[in-house]
Structures are given as C-alpha cells and as structure tokens.
Amino acid sequence: MMDLKLRKDFLADVETAVVSAERKHPKICDNFCTKSKEDIASLLKIRQYLNDKAEGNGSSEWYEVIREEVLEAVEAFNVGQYKLCLQELAQVAAVAVRGMEFVYRLTEEYKAREKFNGGKSD
C-alpha cells in the first residue's frame, strides 16, 4: 500500500489538473457519450470478460481496468442511474491514482526512498 502522504500529493496533482482542464476545455461535457446503450453494454460485457480472464491468469493491465470502469460509468449514465455513475467515476479516479502509484514506484525518488528505509516498501 502506498504512503498516505504520497497519495494525498497525487490527489493534489489531480486537483491541479482539474483546474487546468476547466480552463483548457470549458465545454468538455456537452455530451457524456454518444454511443448507443447497446454498444456500451456490448463493449462493457467484452471488457469485463477479458479483464476477468486476465486477472485469473495474473496478467491484468491498468489500462484495461480503467477502460472497464469508464464503460461502467457510461452504462450507468445511459440508463439514468446518475448516483451509480458518480460512484463509477470515483472508481475511475481511484484506478487513475493507483496508476500514478505504479508509475511512481519506477522513479528514482521512490528507489532512493526505499533504499533509505532499508528496503521496506511503502
């Protein structure tokens, strides 16, 4: 598990990115998704099957997991389940932060910190 201070730093980075995105793309959501409900349901079913299979093989990838979460959010939106859509979008954000944590572990800063802590991971 990642150090909570680092996770807060990542969330602060996300907040900064949101502010920047609001300026850069002020009308980002004129439409949430223009694909049909049927197309989204089909894409989601396929993605869930592939992700379940990958997890069973121990070969799950971040990119595929976040795609599934996005599709789940769109599906909820398409059927008018807005509270569920918000929950799914929170899961998208959680998977994005987990991706940040994964990449951080590849940085020299993390490696130096781990070495300083006697090889103990965050």
Q: What residue spans do the PLM features occupy?
A:
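Flexible "arm" and connector segments at domain edges
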Residues: 1-122
